């Protein structure tokens, strides 16, 4: 789906079992991919996960037209078309918790083991952010340890809210502590806002509400003091920071006025924005990217496609906009497309990562 318009053009087809000579079938050999892009915002939709969505009544998750088709061979071909060397996969909204705790725990394990299988099957082409069964908090920590320590996940993904648990919720503290202790990464992805029944249903929620939801949740993360308590924690915010870049001054102006006596020093949104990491999925050129560059650290910007929810041909056009924009010089553009991701995830510097 194109996040800007809500348009979705699903591709159907069951998962194909790869052949042993798939590197030849899929185009570029490893040594030819050294200059390829690293896509920090890509999704996978294994058939068993699609079936779980359908069984949970999520035929149109977040109001989109349909669940997009996905299989690993098509994904690799589209990555070649996009000049993507490595895609870091994650499960998108609505995640794995549909109301049944046991099912959520089992499904999180299943999608994480599938992510690890893809990484092992295609060295250098895939990484993955592990899914957790939040708000099953104890089980989420167990799954985090298994995914990071055993499966070798590149980090974890947290939805902007998971059944009403936003990123600043104190119950997430054990998860943040585990991630920070491993110098790992939290990738956050928007989902339907909690209480969405009170919102207008006229438009697919990814078009507008996802941007507001990311803004709401990351602001909660900042204002709850998580960056101060875990300074080594690396949070990747999608879609060029949503509305946060243009709200920094307002937050920093009003927060001291609204803080109660005894609450301590108010956190600085502007300082936090320099600490946060941002992918450029969606349509950030020109206005949103200009605003983001005014407040973010350029060394913490990353390419993201949002494939397959953004169709491959739309991904190509959006990447071309990033190639052409005068807001990025050649050095910053190269860093955004691959260098910054190598610094964030050092294992990607290996040709057989």
Predicted regions and their residues:
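Conserved N-terminal glycine/acidic-rich loop preference
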Residues: 185-188, 192, 212-223, 227, ...
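Active-site gating loops and adjacent loop-to-helix segments of metal-dependent hydrolytic enzymes
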Residues: 23, 32-34, 43-70, 100, ...
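Acidic-and-aromatic substrate-binding clefts and catalytic sites of carbohydrate-active enzymes
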Residues: 65-70, 96-97, 134-140, 163-170, ...
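Active-site-adjacent C-terminal substructures of enzyme catalytic domains
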Residues: 211-213, 230-232, 256-257, 261-312
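Mid-to-C-terminal alpha-helical segments outside catalytic/metal-binding sites
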Residues: 2, 6-11, 16-40, 45-86, ...
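Catalytic metal-binding/acid-base residues of hydrolase active sites
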Residues: 43, 191-192, 241, 308
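Hydrophobic faces of well-ordered beta-strands that scaffold small-molecule active sites
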Residues: 38-42, 87-89, 127-130, 156-158, ...
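Active-site gating/metal-coordination segments in enzymes
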Residues: 20, 85, 90-224
């Amino acid at each position: 789906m194109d996040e800007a318009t809500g348009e979705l053009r699903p591709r159907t087809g069951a998962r194909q079992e790869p052949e042993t000579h798939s590197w030849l079938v899929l185009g570029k050999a490893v040594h030819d991919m050294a200059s390829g892009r690293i896509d920090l915002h890509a999704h996978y939709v294994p058939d068993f996960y699609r079936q779980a969505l359908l069984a949970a009544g999520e035929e149109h998750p977040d109001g989109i037209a349909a669940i997009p088709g996905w299989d690993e061979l098509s994904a690799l071909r589209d990555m070649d078309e996009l000049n993507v060397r490595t895609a870091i996969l994650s499960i998108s909204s609505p995640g794995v918790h549909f109301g049944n705790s046991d099912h959520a725990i089992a499904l999180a394990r299943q999608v994480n083991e599938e992510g690890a299988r893809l990484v092992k099957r295609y060295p250098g082409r895939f990484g993955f952010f592990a899914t957790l069964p939040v708000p099953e908090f104890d089980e989420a920590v167990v799954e985090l340890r298994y995914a990071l320590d055993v499966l070798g996940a590149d980090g974890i993904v947290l939805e902007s809210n998971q059944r009403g648990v936003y990123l600043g919720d104190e119950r997430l503290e054990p998860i943040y502590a585990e991630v920070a202790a491993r110098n790992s990464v939290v990738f956050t992805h928007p989902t339907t806002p909690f209480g969405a029944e009170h919102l207008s249903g006229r438009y697919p929620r990814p078009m507008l509400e996802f941007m507001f939801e990311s803004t709401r949740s990351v602001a909660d993360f900042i204002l709850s003091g998580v960056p101060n308590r875990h300074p080594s924690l690396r949070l990747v915010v999608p879609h060029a920071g949503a509305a946060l870049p243009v709200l920094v001054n307002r937050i920093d102006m009003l927060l001291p006025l609204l803080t109660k006596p005894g609450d301590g020093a108010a956190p600085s949104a502007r300082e936090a924005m320099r600490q946060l990491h941002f992918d450029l999925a969606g349509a950030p050129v020109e206005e949103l990217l200009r605003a983001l560059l005014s407040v973010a650290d350029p060394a913490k910007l990353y390419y993201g496609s949002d494939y397959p929810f953004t169709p491959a041909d739309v991904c190509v056009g959006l990447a071309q906009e990033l190639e052409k924009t005068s807001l990025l010089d050649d050095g910053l553009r190269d860093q955004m497309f691959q260098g910054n991701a190598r610094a964030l995830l050092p294992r990607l510097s290996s040709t057989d990562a």
